[in-house]
Every structure is written in structure tokens, then in C-alpha cells.
A protein has these predicted regions:
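Acidic, surface-exposed loops and disordered segments
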Residues: 1-170
Length: 170
């Protein structure tokens, strides 16, 4: 049932880095998003899968991992994602891209959970640095999200809001 996937889909920030992902696996996840609805069927989103160690390291350097944990630079070596999907928007086609990106990102994450994977949707990105490294033309494409993926080391859990109404993560 879909609700079971939703309940398993948490924001995982630590992974078994030695459990590699292939570009083919990432492409399968992307294909799930490819067939989701898009605003006026513009299909403005493009996806860049990354699964090799060298490129993964460069992508990692461009990400901020947890806004509420100011002193945490992200997962340590050995606990980093084994793959990423960079979500791009074709600026010539993009209208209401934030809706489309949300639909696509959630679809990819649910497909990942179905395969026993986990991930984290990241929007705090050094976009200039990432575009430069990946050779993305920022006149034509915007980098809006990076989906970090792998075999989760964290145990996802649901918690109730704090007594003070706080929703900060634990």
C-alpha cells in the first residue's frame, strides 16, 4: 500500500556508503518521476544521475545537510550517499517548477523506499560550484534540488510534536 511507503520514507542523512548504487538504478528512479504530471505538460524538469565516487565527493562538497544542526557538516566519510540525482529545470520551459519538483522528488523517494533505499531531499546547495563541476549551463538550467540516495544507516522513525509544539528534528 502507498501509505506503507510514505511511512517508511524519512529524511535519511547517513548511509552505508560502501553499498554502491549504479547509474542504472538511479535512472530507474528517474523514470518514475518522468511519467508524473507536470504543469501544462511542460516536462521542464531534467535529471542528472551521479553514482561514481569522485563525482559523489564533489557533489557532497556543495551541500548543506541539516539547517537546524548548525555545527554538523553532514555525514562522515563512510556514511555518505552512494548516489545523487540533481534536479534541474529547463528555464525555457519552467513554469510553476516548484510544484513539479515536489511531485518528482517525492515520487523518486517513494520509488527508492520501494527498492529498500532511502534518501534526503536537499535544497541548500552551492549551485554555482555544483554547476561548474558538473558542466551545467546556468543560463539554460537552474539547479533546484539534489536528492541524496543510498542504503540508509539511520533508522527512520516518526515522532509526535514536542510539548511546546516544536517540530525540530531529534
Amino acid at each position: 500500500m502507498l501509505k506503507d511507503l510514505v511511512l517508511k520514507n524519512r529524511s535519511y542523512r547517513r548511509f552505508y556508503q560502501d553499498k554502491k548504487l549504479s547509474v542504472e538504478t538511479l535512472t530507474e528512479l528517474i523514470d518514475c518521476a518522468r511519467v508524473t504530471p507536470s504543469t501544462v505538460n511542460s516536462q521542464a524538469l531534467k535529471f542528472k544521475p551521479v553514482a561514481d565516487d569522485e563525482t559523489n565527493a564533489h557533489v557532497f562538497e556543495c551541500l548543506n545537510w541539516a539547517g537546524l544542526l548548525k555545527d554538523w557538516p553532514g555525514p562522515e566519510e563512510g556514511e555518505r550517499p552512494s548516489g545523487y540525482i540533481v534536479v534541474l529545470c529547463d528555464l525555457a520551459l519552467g513554469r510553476n517548477k516548484y510544484y513539479d519538483e515536489g511531485i518528482a522528488a517525492q515520487t523518486i523517494m517513494l520509488a527508492a523506499v520501494e527498492q529498500g533505499l532511502g534518501g534526503c531531499i536537499l535544497g541548500s546547495i552551492n549551485k554555482e560550484k555544483l554547476a561548474s563541476y558538473l558542466g551545467i549551463d546556468t543560463e539554460k538550467y537552474s539547479i533546484d534540488l539534489v536528492l541524496a540516495l543510498g542504503s540508509p544507516k539511520d533508522e527512520g522513525r516518526l515522532t509526535e510534536d514536542g510539548a511546546d509544539g516544536s517540530t525540530a528534528y531529534y
